[in-house]
Amino acid sequence: MRLFTKIKGLAAVTCVAALASSAAFAQEMTLKLGHLANEQNAWHLAAVKFGEELSTLTDGRIAVEVFPNESLGKEIDLINGMQLGTVDMTITGESLQNWAPMAALLAVPYAYKSLEHMDEVASGEIGEQIKQQIIEKAQVRPIAFFARGPRNLTSQRPITSPADLDGMKMRVPNVPLFVDVWSALGASPTPMAFSEVFTSLQNGVIDGQENPLALIRSANFNEVQGYVNQTEHVRSWIYLTIAESTWAKLSEDDQNAVMQAAATAQEYERGLLLESLAEDRGYLESKGMTFVEVDGAAFQAAAKDAVLANVSEEIRPIVESLFSE
């Protein structure tokens, strides 16, 4: 059951994601889960699903209040709140590298060849090392992971290999890793604010940009770009997390219930992601954009040295091994 309740002083709607199904069971605990996405985002819907499942599994004893749109605080503030015991849960990703350097592995360009490869890493030995470091150094416990849509390059001409970039002016985020990788690939990367991208494409200041399909769609880049080149250069994931201090208050049975509800939320979010990717592609194609397959191996090989030069010494051997897989 999802309830939407206006909370005074908050900028957005608070979703109460769980209620006791019977008056015979008294609510014992309410977990506050804040995140940055809006109510339509798959992460938010998965967070609500988590609350519903946890309520069912605990006979209504544990409720989850979901606060979207940064209404409980910005991402770093939420992590700090979890460490202080004022926030119970959030959805977060590579921001955790401020405490746990291995969290940078959540979004390394060309480290993951496919969604399946990323899943293997996130749920395997490397993923376990990342989670343990986050628990130890950030006092935040990852309990599920949500995949993000891969980033793709848009342009006014088809790009199938690094050679096709040939100095193409393209917008990138103001992140040294992105600038260096696209320079190594042969483009001319130009950091700029996202709010300036559409007009810059329209006026020819830049020739391309890179983002996930959902953002390409919502920003109406189909009006100023003709091609989506499926570079999929960044595959990444993000964690549903619970504060260690909150986790420690739970009985073993309730901890098991939390993990079971988190697994359900993870599966639910994956279904939403795949639906969204297919829907966004169909929409962009209907608006005239052409999807182009690229030589992924050639892009990865050209980007490797720049990626390795930009990651920390602690994770460099792992990144090198991922490139070799």
UniProtKB/Swiss-Prot annotation:
GO terms under biological process: transmembrane transport
Record carries keyword Transport: yes
Sorted UniProt keywords: Periplasm, Signal, Sugar transport, Transport
GO cellular-component term (any): outer membrane-bounded periplasmic space
Subcellular location(s) per record: Periplasm
Chain sites annotated for binding L-galactonate: E75, G93, E94, S95, R148, G149, P150, R151, R171, N211
Residues involved in D-mannonate binding: E75, G93, E94, S95, R148, G149, P150, R151, R171, N211
CDD domains according to UniProt: PBP2_TRAP_Siap_TeaA_like
Origin superkingdom: Bacteria
Coiled-coil residue windows: none
Quaternary structure note: The complex is comprised of an extracytoplasmic solute-binding protein and a heteromeric permease formed by two transmembrane proteins.
Purpose: Solute-binding protein that binds L-galactonate and D-mannonate (in vitro). Probably part of a tripartite ATP-independent periplasmic (TRAP) transport system that mediates solute transport into the cytoplasm.
Name listed for the protein in its UniProt record: Solute-binding protein RD1_1052
Organism lineage: Bacteria, Pseudomonadati, Pseudomonadota, Alphaproteobacteria, Rhodobacterales
